[in-house]
Amino acid sequence: MNGTDAEPMLDTEPVLRTDYLGLHLKSPLVAAASALGESLDNILRLEDAGAAAIVLPSIFEEQILLENAALENDLTRGTESFAESLDYFPGTPSLHHEMEHYLNLIRAAKNRCEIPILASLNGATPGGWVSFAQQIEQAGADALELNTYALATGFLKTSAIIEDGLVDLVHRVRQSVQLRLAVKLSPYFTSIPHLARQMDDAGADALVLFNRFYQPDFDIENLAVVPKLTLSRPEELLLRLHWVAILYGHLRAELAVTGGVHGVEDVLKSIMAGAQVVQLASALLRHGVGHIDTLHSGLLRWMREHEYASIRQMRGSLSRRSAPDPSAFERGNYIRTLSSYTLRYKNLQQY
């Protein structure tokens, strides 16, 4: 039996309970932000299927701004001729339909569900992050995930400017709400440990690794750039495991894995690397929400077979901090891996 925290064996069912963002969860299986959480009916289906918590789809500040701009255009079209018509319409600030729909979804989910409901926010301006975070808190969300999905396309914006901006927004939101905050990061930073420590210091309660950028494809026949969405693959998990294992034990913030978690082994590897929870999206879109129960049953079966009494017992057992050979996470292992692959290739040439 392996593990960093020795526990006496229990003659009972293995314990899947875990804590995340100050919430007591029945298991580490969390439904990630996706289209599955866009309606109350689907949210209830996810709860019935065994999700320990649900992250609602991200509300994007651009959605609200674009809607308001279109509404403003509709309300003012022709008013240079009929100025009195403005008296019949309320001002646009009260007509945030997208935001109000999102807040109503939070309220409805909290009213009907027994499991925690986490909101997800992707802002475009510092003021937008703060304002929307405050409204989300007032609506009753149990926690808030800051989805820092931003592409650096400007040639004058340095990596330091981008990272300082992200840290500043976390600090601003932290100062404005009492909600527990998770920050969803991308893997494309020069020094992930340094940024993680800065996020930790700024008040992030958890880091979610990693965001997936949805990259457009090229249509060579019509000379067009077209949107393309692909589900994650299990091999994408390796990058997440690597960084969670490195960060585990060095931050106050908790760690969550999202992207590439499809099977029971993926869940186990994530926890052994140091994650508190895993977030599931592509696996549920591919296999259906009933896949949560498949993973739940598989976890219990594996833990019984390997004599683990609880999830906590295995957490971090494969982290860099617990590894007898830390070089497995560093350059030395890269060299050994290449050498091993070269040797196998030479052996194949003999046939």
Q: What kind of region is each of these model predictions?
A:
Residues 1-10, 232-252, 264-351:
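Alpha/beta catalytic cores of nucleotide-metabolism and tRNA/nucleoside-modifying enzymes
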Residues 2-30, 102-110:
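N-terminal amphipathic alpha-helix/helix-capping segment at the start of soluble metabolic enzymes
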Residues 11-20, 59, 226, 280:
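Residue-level signal for pocket-adjacent positions within structured domains
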Residues 18, 30, 115, 253-256, ...:
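Short glycine- and Lys/Arg-enriched binding-loop motifs that mark or flank ligand-binding interfaces
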Residues 23-32, 88-92, 180-182:
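Short, basic, glycine/proline-bearing loop/turn elements
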Residues 33-37:
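Glycine-rich phosphate/pyrophosphate-binding beta-alpha loops
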Residues 40-61, 65-80, 97-118, 122-257, ...:
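Alpha/beta enzyme core
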Residues 84-93, 230:
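Short glycine/proline- and acidic residue-enriched helix-loop micro-motifs
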